[in-house]
């Protein structure tokens, strides 16, 4: 929906609160103590009460807004802005649009939303024909490494390793100028190293066993055949990358350009949240106006695990 439709649909705090309650009622409220699925709604307290053990939980409990003191409308506006464009918004721009004074609560809110985006995508595994490769994303140099000489190449302190996976299949009679493959879903996962065991564990978790996998001939991928239907490892010349692994490298290039243009000095420990947002929106690129509704469902279905490293605790914002 465009901005005018959004304002008409959610004009105030009450409209946003009612929408959250509507979504929670549709999905179902589960008691945190006895797992009972039957609840009363206490209008005067604005909370649910379990019919069995009479424990109560707030409207925000178990959602992305859990423990947050920010207005419901902040969350709605942020989710709308994040999903209304192919690109993203910096936290500073979101703070300015919301008219909030402090940066920190808005930054935490946005990363909590990115966290549940990742949780939703982790419900699914990639399948079919798939490309896989690793990439190095530029990140902020850790504080303890800033006084040390900067290494060059892949071992640089300013680079973070990411495993990139893309479902793709060859197209019959591709049109002139088009890619020989078409892409479906992608996943990106920050990894600590390129050891075979590390990559294999990620693939085992994120990829279905029936997958037909295509990679380069790196020794990091030698054990992947144990967890997929077939694995083709090719020696790929640079000029053949767009033919053999096109969508992995298109995704890498697009993500790097987005982060460079919109976000600056991303820390390694937060890179995964930015990748979550990129993959979530890429995987739903044909949803159109429905992407906001889908994100809203995820927002009431998952509580975030995001923790601020600044204070080393989950913050309420």
Regions found by a protein language model. Name each.
Residues 1-317:
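Residue-level recognition of single "structural anchor" positions
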């Amino acid at each position: 929906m465009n901005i005018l439709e959004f304002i008409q649909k959610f004009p105030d705090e009450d409209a946003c609160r009612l929408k959250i309650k509507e979504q929670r009622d549709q999905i179902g409220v589960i008691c945190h103590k006895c797992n009972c699925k039957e609840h009363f709604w206490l209008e005067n307290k604005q909370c649910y009460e379990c019919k069995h053990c009479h424990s109560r939980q707030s409207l925000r409990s178990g959602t992305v807004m859990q423990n947050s003191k920010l207005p419901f409308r902040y969350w709605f506006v942020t989710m709308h802005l994040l999903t209304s464009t192919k690109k993203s918004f910096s936290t500073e721009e979101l703070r300015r649009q919301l008219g909030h004074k402090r940066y920190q609560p808005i930054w935490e809110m946005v990363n909590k939303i990115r966290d549940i985006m990742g949780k939703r995508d982790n419900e699914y595994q990639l399948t079919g024909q798939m490309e896989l490769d690793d990439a190095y994303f530029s990140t902020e140099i850790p504080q303890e490494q800033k006084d040390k000489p900067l290494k060059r190449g892949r071992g640089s302190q300013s680079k973070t390793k990411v495993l990139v996976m893309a479902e793709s299949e060859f197209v019959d009679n591709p049109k002139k100028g088009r890619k020989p493959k078409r892409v479906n879903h992608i996943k990106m996962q920050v990894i600590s190293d390129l050891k075979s065991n590390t990559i294999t564990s990620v693939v085992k978790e994120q990829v279905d066993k029936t997958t037909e996998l295509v990679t380069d001939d790196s020794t990091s991928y030698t054990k992947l055949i144990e967890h997929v239907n077939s694995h083709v490892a090719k020696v790929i010349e640079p000029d053949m990358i767009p033919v053999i692994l096109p969508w992995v490298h298109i995704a890498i290039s697009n993500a790097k350009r987005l982060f460079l243009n919109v976000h600056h000095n991303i820390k390694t420990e937060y890179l995964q949240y930015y990748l979550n947002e990129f993959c979530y929106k890429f995987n739903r690129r044909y949803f159109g106006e429905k992407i906001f509704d889908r994100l809203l469902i995820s927002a009431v279905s998952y509580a975030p695990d995001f923790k601020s490293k600044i204070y080393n605790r989950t913050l309420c914002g």
